[in-house]
From Swiss-Prot:
GO MF, any single term: copper ion binding
Record-stated family: Belongs to the CutC family.
Gene designation per UniProt: cutC
Name under which the protein is recorded: PF03932 family protein CutC
Subunit-level organization: Homodimer.
Top-level taxon: Bacteria
Swiss-Prot/TrEMBL keywords: Cytoplasm
GO CC terms of this entry: cytoplasm
Length: 248
C-alpha cells in the first residue's frame, strides 16, 4: 500500500496527522520558508508524544541549497542531535553552485546519519540534471527522494516522476508539492509508492488585539495573524483513497 507522509510544523499538526491516518511525518519549522530545522524543544516533545515515524528536516535557512561551511557544520550537528534523540530518519539536501548533488557533503551527511533513513528533499528539483542526480543519490545510499518532477507542483511533473520511478527501486521516489485528495489517484495509478502532502490550511490567529501598523517580519505583506494547521479531514480523505486503491 502506498505510504502517506504529512508535512507538520508543530506538535498540534503532528497529533492531527497521526490521528487521521498518516503513515509518517516530515517535521519542520517555518512554513513560510518552505521548512527549516525544528528547535530542540519541538524535536524532543514530538519524539515523546508521536508514535508513527517522524523524519525531521535538516535545513538551516531558506533559499538555495548551497551552504557555507558554517551552515553545513550546523547541519551535521543537527543530524547528530536527531540521531541521539532516536528518530528513524531525516530529510535534507545539498547542492553545488552548478546545480549538482554535492557528493562530498552527502558522504559526510550519510556518515553522520548512520542507520537513519535519509530523504533527499526538493533540492532535487533544483538540480541541473535529475537523472544524473538520482544516480548519484543511489550511489550515496539515500533512501528516498522527494520531488515534484522539477515542476511547480507534482501534478505538472508527473511524467518526469514516472521516468524517475522507471530508473529502479532505489531510492524510492516520493511525489510531493500540491498532492491533495483531488489528484492523489493520478499518482497511485502511475505507480508512485509514497506521497507527501501538507494537507494544511491557514487559520486566523485567536489574537483579539492587533497592532496593524507594526510587523515583526521583514516581509511587510506577510500575514502575521494566521497560523498553519494540518487539516485532519484532508489527511483522512487521502488515506481512504489509498486504502481503496489497494483493495482494487
Amino acid at each position: 500500500m502506498a505510504l502517506l507522509e504529512i508535512c507538520c510544523y508543530s506538535m498540534e499538526c503532528a497529533l492531527t496527522a497521526q490521528r487521521n491516518g498518516a503513515d509518517r511525518i516530515e517535521l519542520c519549522a517555518a512554513p513560510k520558508e518552505g521548512g527549516l530545522t525544528p528547535s530542540f524543544g519541538v524535536l524532543r516533545s514530538v519524539r515523546e508524544h508521536i508514535t508513527i515515524p517522524i523524519h525531521p528536516i535538516i535545513r538551516p535557512r531558506g533559499g538555495d541549497f548551497y551552504y557555507t561551511d558554517g551552515e553545513f557544520a550546523a547541519m551535521l550537528e543537527d543530524i547528530r542531535l536527531v540521531r541521539e534523540l532516536g528518530f528513524p530518519g531525516l530529510v535534507t539536501g545539498v547542492l553545488t553552485v552548478d546545480g549538482d548533488v554535492d557528493m562530498s557533503r552527502m558522504e559526510k551527511i550519510m556518515a553522520a546519519a548512520g542507520p537513519l533513513a535519509v530523504t533527499f528533499h526538493r533540492a532535487f528539483d533544483m538540480c541541473a540534471n535529475p537523472f544524473n542526480a538520482l544516480k548519484n543519490l543511489a550511489d550515496a545510499g539515500v533512501a528516498r527522494v522527494l520531488t515534484s518532477g522539477q515542476k511547480a507542483d507534482a501534478a505538472q511533473g508527473l511524467s518526469i516522476i514516472m521516468e524517475l520511478i522507471a530508473q529502479g527501486d532505489a531510492p524510492i521516489i516520493m511525489a510531493g508539492a500540491g498532492v491533495r485528495a483531488n489528484n492523489l489517484q493520478n499518482f497511485l495509478d502511475a505507480g508512485v509508492r509514497e506521497v507527501h502532502s501538507s494537507a494544511g490550511v491557514l487559520l486566523p490567529s485567536p489574537m483579539r488585539y492587533r497592532n496593524q501598523g507594526l510587523s515583526m517580519s521583514a516581509d511587510i505583506q506577510a500575514d502575521e495573524y494566521s497560523r498553519y494547521r494540518v487539516e485532519g479531514a484532508a489527511v483522512a480523505e487521502m488515506k481512504g483513497i489509498i486504502v481503496r486503491h489497494q483493495a482494487k
